[in-house]
Amino acid sequence: MKHMKRFSASVVALALTTFGLTGVAPAQAANKTDLVLGVVAEVTTWDPIGANIGHYIPYYQAVYDNLILRTPDGKYKANLATKWQVADDSKSMTIDLRTGVKFSDGAKFDAAAAKANLDSYIAGVGPYTAKLSGTTVSVVDSDTIKLTMANPNPEIVYWLATTGSFMASPNVLKTAGLKTKPVGSGPYTLESATVGSQYVFKATPGYWDKSKQKFSKITFKFLSDNTARLNALLGGQVDAAYLTAATVQVAKSKGKTVTADARAVDYKGLVLFDRAGNKNPALGKLEVRQALNYAIDRKALARAVEVNAQPTTQIFSPNGTAYSKSLDSYYSYNPTKAKELMAKAGYADGFTLNLNNWAETNLNALVEGYLKAINVKVNWVQDTNWYANAKGGKFEAIIMQIFQGTDLVTAETAVAKDGGWNNLKYESSAMKKAWAVLSQTGTANQVKVQTANMNRIAVEEAWFVPFYRVLHYVGTSNRVKATVQAQNAVPYLYNYAPTGK
C-alpha cells in the first residue's frame, strides 16, 4: 500500500521530536558520501512490530537487518539468514543464521535473539503481523531456528524479507524506548530525528555487509507536498525524490534522471468495503457494484490524471500468474448498461455513496461526474484521519492507491476475510470455497490455481472498482543512481548508489 498521507501519533511524535540533536540544519545534498532523500512519509514507531512496506520500509532498512534480503527483481538472497529451507507443505521452515553479528548496543545476534524478535512480532499488532500469526519459533541450536506454521504459509519467505523479520536488540524488545529510538544491527544508526522535517542516519562502524553501506550519512527529508519535493530535487536540497505524474515532466525538462517502474506496482480505484450492504444497502447489491464499474471511463480518466497509467478492472498484478488480460477490460465504459443494472437492483433513482476526500481533486471531480451520470451522488467525507478510520471499518468505500504484491500477498491482503483491505470482513460463498481449498495445501500449483480463481471472483462479484495501474517515478540528480524495487512504491534503501559525481 502506498498511501501518500502523513499519519500522526501524538505521543510517539513528541518522543521522536525530542530524540537526537536540536536545531538540526536543513539537509543539503552536499558531497559524494552523503545521500539525501525527499520522502512522502515518516515513521510513527521504530518498533519492528509497526513496520510497513511502501514508502516506510526504507526507514527500517536503515537501522535493522532482515533475516532474508529481497533483491530489486524480487528474488531472495542471504542476509542474517545464510540459508533456509521451507517444507513442501509450507508448514515449517528451518533457518541457518549468520554468526558474528552484533547489535548497535553490543548485544549478540543469535538464535535466541532471532526467536525473541519473531515471538515479539507474532504476538504484536501491526500492519502485517497477522501474516505470521499461528507461527511458533523454536531454537534448534545457537545459530539455527525452526518456524512451524499452523496453516500453510507459501509466502513466508516474502514476509521474512519485508516486514516480518527486522531484528532489534533483545535488550530493548517490548520496551517503550524502542518506539522512539531504534537499536538494530543495520547498516546505519539514527543520529537525530525532527518529526515533520528530517531523520539523519550515520553509517554504523564495523557493519558486517559493506555492500549495503554505500553512503556515510543518509538523510530522509520529509516533504509531503508534491511541489515542494520537486523543488527540493531541482534546487539540490535532495539527491532523490518520489515524483508524481504531475511533476515527472518538469523534472525531466530540468535535466533530472527519472526512473519509472514499468511494472506498475499499485492500482488506483474504489475499494467497496461494504459488499454485504450493512452500512449502505445499495452496495450489498451485486448489480449496483457492477454498475459502478460500468460507469467509469477508465481510459479517459487515466489520460486526464496520470502519465502512462494502465486502465484495468482487476487488482492483481500483470507480473503474476493470477492475472488475466481479459479481466483488464471486463467492465467497459457503458453508462447505459450501468443505469439498467441500477434499475434492476431497485436503485433507478440512485443513492448516496460516502467516500473519503482523496487528495487528487481533479480525479475526485471526474469520478463524481461519472457516478452522477447514473444517479449516484458522492458525499466527500472530510476526515483528516480517513486512512485509520477506513482501516477501523468506519467507511463503506474509499478511493485509494494500493500496492499489487505477489499473487498470494494480494489475495491475503485484499480478498481474504481477515485481509488488511477487507476491512468489513466480507466473504462470499465463492471466495470462501476458494480459500478453503487453498488452506488445505500450500503447494505452488494450488496457489497458482486458487489466486487466479480469486481474481476472477473479485472481478465478477465487483468487490472493487479499479481505475488503472499506476507507475511510480523516482527523480535523481547526477550524483545518485536508483534501481526500482519489485512490488514497492520506492526503491529499497540498498537500491541507491553513488555515481561518483
Enumerate the predicted regions with their spans.
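Aromatic- and charge-enriched surface segment that lines or borders ligand/interaction sites
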Residues: 82-125, 140, 146, 282-283
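Ligand-site clamp/hinge motif
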Residues: 206-251, 377
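Gly/Pro-rich hinge or "lid" segments in bacterial periplasmic/extracellular proteins
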Residues: 75, 161-213, 217, 335-336
